[in-house]
Swiss-Prot record:
GO terms for molecular function: magnesium ion binding; phosphoenolpyruvate carboxylase activity. This is Phosphoenolpyruvate carboxylase. Belongs to the PEPCase type 1 family. It catalyses: oxaloacetate + phosphate = phosphoenolpyruvate + hydrogencarbonate. PROSITE patterns: PEPCASE_1, PEPCASE_2. Its cofactor is Mg(2+). GO terms for biological process: carbon fixation; oxaloacetate metabolic process; tricarboxylic acid cycle.
Amino acid sequence: MTQEYSTLRNNISMLGRFLGETINDAQGEDILELIENIRKLSRNSRAGDDKARQALLDTLGSISNENIIPVARAFSQFLNLTNIAEQYQTISREHSLAQSSSQSLSELFKRLKEQNASVEEVHKTVEKLLIELVLTAHPTETTRRSLIHKHIEINKCLSKLEHHDLTEKERNIIERLLLRLIAEAWHTNEIRTVRPTPFDEAKWGFAMLENSLWQAVPEFLRQLNETTREFLGYDLPVGLKPVRISSWMGGDRDGNPFVTAQITKKVLYFARWKAADLFLQDISKLADELSMMKCSDEFRDKYGEHLEPYRFVVKNLRNQLTATLAYFDDHLSNRTPRVSESEIILEDNQLWEPLYDCYQSLIQCGMRIIANGSLLDILHRISCFGVTLSQMDIRQESTRHTDAIAEITRYIGLGDYSQWMEDDKQAFLIRELSSRRPLIPQNWTPSPETKEILDTCKVIAQQKQGVIACYVISMARSASDVLAVHLLLKESGVPYHIPVVPLFETLEDLDAAEKVMTQLFNVGWYRGVINNRQMVMIGYSDSAKDAGMMAASWAQYRAQEALVNLTEKLGIELTLFHGRGGTIGRGGAPAHAALLSQPPRSLKNGLRVTEQGEMIRFKLGLPAVAVETFDLYASAILEANLLPPPEPKPEWRTIMDELSTISCDIYRGVVRGDKDFVPYFRSATPEQELSKLPLGSRPAKRNPNGGVESLRAIPWIFAWMQNRLMLPAWLGAGAAIRQIIEQGKGDIIHKMCENWPFFSTRIGMLEMVFSKSDTWLSQQYDQRLVKKELWYLGENLRKQLEDDIQTVLSLSHQSKLMSDLPWIADSIALRNIYTDPLNLLQVELLHRFRENPEQVNPDVEQALMITITGIAAGMRNTG
């Protein structure tokens, strides 16, 4: 065991000991003894002791309603503490000393140097680097903000304890604080009592920006600059914008009726208020620092003669930011603003220009070290966040726009637009887009649904250019879907061009993406307004839910490849926007591997990717973790562009086509083809009970009366993750590979594993999923919750899972899963001891819950919700 791993185990053990002390004080010795007995039985059960396994089942099956909540909370909270310790370990000093990641920027630059890469080419590629993270409020964050704050403080304590020169008194003070924080977490309700509103979700996102990214972005840019200076011998331009932050919070109305035009407006005001607040804090500190008297002649000519010239400029900005804060505070409180727009800061350049002038003057006067202090950090924050804190995406489903235009055409006597052929729709839209007269009559009263669409477009029209990053159309299927949004924006008075982004998300839509975009690019009006720039979003969640992981990932690859080739041919700059989740079933994979498995040239214009729910906290929740995440993203993007992955060989493509067809048929044969599947799914997972957990503002279903097809991808995956069958992430994939091997093509499959990052990443993702799955636990759900006549389905699926595990092991030439990543294998093994009791308790609670759903004991309902959040913590994934 390495010293680093030993420290991690010691930290987990210490946190567990403090949790035990807290439970003893709060609940008494008897409860602590019960919890400890369950833990030991679980550990022995995992070690293969059948008697312990039966005793574990008996103990959890007979647990009283009075004891279920403290038992569920104990195991759930321990898993949260394990996550904290593991997250800290990745940024600890010990970790930094122990290993220099082969995926880091500095290691990439070393490789580039060894391979005699062109310095000019590297220079050019670094200056084009773009990482745009789009924070979304998808309901996958099961941990309350109140607890997240305490978890951050626990992390800070672990950091302090890492110093080996602490006195005994200092160590005792830190450990007492740790014990207090764990006690505070224990006495805090981990389940939200009310579902968050879209505005609450936006505030959560902005808190993440304030507490982590505000510090992380300038730190990463310093690190990036030091690396380029060391390896390339030059400093990056101060105005470079390699990191951008956008958000769907307050803008994503797809399937969420609670995100209205008014909410969007309120979130935009709040974002500006928060940005003014953060910049005001920075500027106030800067005013204390910039006491220097000497400035350049140009600076003096521009700002006048002052004893302390920099302070004069900075104090003016402080006054403007104070007025800006008051202005947006009045708007948020529905008061008439006390100050006018002319007195406040509304555009980035109003902050950037005077501060950049200060920066240049300090450099010219020999004060580079001062210029490169907190002033440079503020300039970097202006470049990344701007005075709006983040850009906002608007997202809406395509049929909502079709319905709105159809309502207009019916009113003005042109018939029903929604029933027209695609060619007729396009002709009408192009005619109206080219026309100077308005389409919508002044005295017309639209339906509430259409009014909401138009009101949203009017909110966009009220914003300055750049505040809204783009308008995303989910379930985009045709060129008219894109043109329709352009028309609605025009009719609502938007005076500038906004990127309208089609989101292709089902298997059929991904396959048709090239054809749809070709039609669009053939429209003269459209080519005229896009300025040879196009963004296209690739949907990972719904395509995997529609066709299974293997078929979906190949369709995503082919769609990206086709779009890259098409836009290169036409001289259009393409940005691919990746709608990934944290789980394998929603396109999740380790960032570096995921990016290097994309088609060649697909990252040449940078990366735009969603960061969702709990993954925001895991990857960006602490400044040091966020810096590491940016470093990994930057390294992968630069590597993909400078050392691109190989083009797949023709025989690899043929194999992937076959794998895709076979796996899709197997997946759909189960999910769509078996009439018993839906009742089995609803019985064997907590899918129905999940809707009671107030995770996010968005309903779990697009259509409340629909079946699996109407269920959103997130609860679909969340439900299967809970019962440890993990079905969406593997069904069809392993069986398809086995069929291909049995056809005598095993050699080609092995070569694909060894030489093609796209395929090897898929196999690695399968291995990770299999490591977290558990057929015995899945069987417990079936036997306790599912009608006997449906048991065959679970038995077939578990047999399929076991066969697939053997297939993947045969490819890796290993006897055990995750043999090449023992640290992860050990982490999963440790978590299983605490997750198993939560799974078995969940089975018992679901049984009690469903026995008499009209009169559920409140303790049973509360404990059930705790098991759901606890298992999510144990799996490190929700949706």
